[in-house]
Amino acid sequence: MTNIRKSHPLMKIINNAFIDLPAPSNISSWWNFGSLLGICLILQILTGLFLAMHYTSDTTTAFSSVTHICRDVNYGWVIRYLHANGASMFFICLFIHVGRGLYYGSYMFLETWNIGVILLFTVMATAFMGYVLPWGQMSFWGATVITNLLSAIPYIGTNLVEWIWGGFSVDKATLTRFFAFHFILPFIIAALATVHLLFLHETGSNNPTGISSDMDKIPFHPYYTIKDILGALFMMLILLILVLFSPDLLGDPDNYTPANPLNTPPHIKPEWYFLFAYAILRSIPNKLGGVLALVASILILILMPMLHTSKQRSMMFRPLSQCLFWVLVADLITLTWIGGQPVEHPFIIIGQLASILYFLIILVLMPITSIIENNLLKW
């Protein structure tokens, strides 16, 4: 008799994706973050669902409903802070996951990589709209500033912004539609993640060496299931420490003040995970130029396969490229820091230099370094 997990139509799919999947024998802990992202998504959908049961998407009651969740709902504060800090964990895992892809040349799986970039955009859009929902000062002004950037688009800009707002300013209509989109997008993300996985399983996983591992595969279960569980426990530990000891560490104090269209906060800034892009946006003194740089800073990932000039796929045996990669990481940390600082000297010039360096490393220095490494190896 055939095993039910190999014969049943549904179980067969799960079996081929998570149990009998042939996986490289040498993938390191950097490969854990895909499963961690899946766990983050499930956590966000579940906590979000319970929050939506008590939240009201109306400008007059939104702020009060969030306060009500924290004060009156059983363990509402835990659910709320799990959701808020869960988003931060989501982005930490996302950035590491993308960084792993860049370091080990995983972008050579074109379909998987492109779906991944689309996923990144979708998650960023979802997080932005979620930040607007508590209707605090930073929610309101963040929404106003970021949506207003679309007005930089020639000819249709102003109409587009008013269409998104549903009026002449961020108001009740904006909040309601943002809530609707924030609710539906995670399910679209889940569908895209399934497609992401589908394309990955067409080629099989990459590994740290960047060399085909077809001759040396091991079953996903039990080896990588247990490894993923360990990673998940570590992530949950960090998340629970954040939630239970300093839930507001990554938030903005301004968001504890109800939204007031007549009072602008001194420093409008998004959540920490958008600060690098915000710094790039601010470093260009022209509105349209800034918006284009902002979009380009993420969209540049799509160009990675075309910018790959090395004869080796992975950076594992390429010390010069490794140095550049870590300079890029340091540059992104610098941009994140600058994005949270006021627009004044010396932060302006640091931000501009860091922004130039970001594009310079990816578009110029990395491809040239790869060619130099090829020549050093006489390839």
Swiss-Prot record:
GO terms for molecular function: metal ion binding; ubiquinol-cytochrome-c reductase activity. Binds 2 heme b groups non-covalently. Its cofactor is heme b. InterPro entries: Cyt_b/b6_C, Cyt_b/b6_C_sf, Cyt_b/b6_N, Cytb/b6-like_sf, Cytochrome_b, Cytochrome_b_C_euk/bac, Cytochrome_b_N_euk/bac, Di-haem_cyt_TM. One of its GO terms (biological process) is mitochondrial electron transport, ubiquinol to cytochrome c. The cytochrome bc1 complex contains 11 subunits: 3 respiratory subunits (MT-CYB, CYC1 and UQCRFS1), 2 core proteins (UQCRC1 and UQCRC2) and 6 low-molecular weight proteins (UQCRH/QCR6, UQCRB/QCR7, UQCRQ/QCR8, UQCR10/QCR9, UQCR11/QCR10 and a cleavage product of UQCRFS1). This cytochrome bc1 complex then forms a dimer. Belongs to the cytochrome b family. This is Cytochrome b. It comes from Phacochoerus africanus (Warthog). The lineage of its organism: Eukaryota, Metazoa, Chordata, Craniata, Vertebrata. The gene is MT-CYB.
